[in-house]
């Protein structure tokens, strides 16, 4: 009975650890979904994709790319952007909901969006002045951190 308990604990530990192991591997730009390549061509004109990788973790699949200007972008398996980090310039305003962009333009006229993360529930933004803003799915501001 003691051996069975130990075996059960070992099996349980192995299955608990499985989601933490991710398969990350570089891929060719042509292996990216067309939606990702089109997004980059539309909103990051003048840059090229310097590096691309796919990450498989349990049921999560995402694409990560680095552009020639140092920008880092992440996309889900459907090719929708989930995170954008810019080094020297603003996240393109055309991809930010107009209600959020207007709030930032009015409230922080000298700042721009350096980073944005988005999922079905939230938009999290980091501005060039160091403020971190969180908006809910209704585009209502719900948190500010400095």
Q: PLM features: what roles do these ranges have?
A:
Residues 1-26:
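Bacterial Sec-dependent N-terminal signal peptides
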Residues 23-146:
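Interaction-mediating elements
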């Amino acid at each position: 009975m003691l051996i069975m308990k130990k075996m059960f604990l070992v099996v349980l530990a192995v299955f608990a650890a499985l989601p933490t192991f991710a398969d990350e591997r570089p891929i060719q730009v042509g292996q990216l979904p067309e939606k990702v390549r089109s997004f980059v061509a539309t909103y990051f004109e003048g840059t090229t994709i310097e590096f691309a990788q796919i990450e498989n973790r349990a049921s999560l699949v995402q694409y990560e790319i680095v552009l020639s200007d140092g920008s880092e972008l992440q996309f889900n398996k459907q090719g929708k952007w989930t995170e954008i980090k810019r080094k020297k310039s603003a996240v393109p305003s055309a991809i930010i909901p107009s209600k959020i962009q207007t709030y930032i333009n009015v409230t922080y006229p000298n700042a721009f969006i350096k980073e944005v993360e988005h999922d079905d529930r939230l938009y999290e933004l980091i501005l060039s002045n160091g403020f971190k803003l969180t908006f809910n799915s209704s585009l209502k501001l719900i948190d500010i951190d400095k």
